[in-house]
């Protein structure tokens, strides 16, 4: 039996907009992110990311594309090289593009300040800082290349609630300051409500509901969305 990981997904995200992808585990959220970034090729349809079709890019063009579209993963510890200092890890994308180490570290210093990290952490290793600090490093690293699109795949799931709030505030500030297009992937309705202008609710790879976040969450039309929201204990969405 053929199973479609994604089926008929239609999604447009503009500069300065944060679009949420909401659904349960296994709904196809992360698969959609991988297709948008060109890590997976769709069997049909068209994907355009920053004006390009990522699955059809020549090898020589992929490095330029990676500059325009960046991803932040859930597990910041796995995302960072344990043998590299945080400063060098954040500067890695610049170094791959022949930026000198002093110039790259200067850019990283500016971004550490932007994401709320002290400069002294640039000489630390990933296992020497907290999970929230590591995630801020990953955000700084994603911003070094001045991307047009940022995809955040469950970026606060592994963090304590108090740290989650700080990271979500950071994402909101960065969107306003940098005019980024952002796709925020999460199973958590509270997270989507906090940071997203619009939302697509996904079930079994298909979009069951899409619209302005406040409207979707306060007046859901889909039974799946209503059930998803009702499953959150202590929440009075409906």
Which residues fall in each region the model found?
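Conserved ABC ATPase "signature" region
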Residues: 102-120, 229-230
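A short, surface-exposed alpha-helical micro-motif characterized by mixed small hydrophobic
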Residues: 192-194
């Amino acid at each position: 039996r053929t199973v479609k990981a994604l089926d008929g997904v239609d999604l447009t995200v503009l500069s300065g907009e944060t679009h949420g992808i909401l659904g349960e585990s296994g709904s196809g959220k992360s698969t959609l992110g991988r297709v948008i970034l060109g890590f997976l090729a769709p069997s049909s349809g068209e994907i355009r990311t920053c004006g390009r079709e990522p699955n059809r890019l020549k090898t020589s063009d992929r490095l330029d594309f990676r500059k325009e579209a960046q991803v932040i993963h859930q597990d910041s510890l796995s995302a960072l090289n344990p043998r590299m200092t945080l400063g060098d890890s954040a500067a890695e994308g610049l170094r791959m593009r022949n930026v000198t180490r002093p110039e790259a570290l200067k850019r990283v210093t500016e971004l550490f300040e932007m994401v709320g990290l002290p400069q002294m952490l640039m000489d630390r290793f990933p296992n020497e800082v907290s999970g929230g600090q590591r995630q801020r490093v990953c955000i700084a690293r994603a911003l070094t290349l001045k991307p047009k699109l940022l995809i955040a795949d469950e970026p606060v799931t592994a963090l304590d609630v108090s740290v989650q709030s700080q990271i979500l505030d950071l994402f909101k500030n960065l969107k306003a300051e940098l005019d980024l297009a952002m796709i925020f992937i999460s199973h958590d309705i509270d997270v989507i409500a906090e940071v997203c202008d619009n939302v697509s609710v996904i079930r079994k790879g298909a979009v069951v509901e899409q619209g302005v976040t406040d409207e979707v969450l306060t007046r859901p039309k889909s039974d799946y969305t209503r059930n998803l929201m009702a499953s959150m204990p202590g929440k009075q969405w409906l």
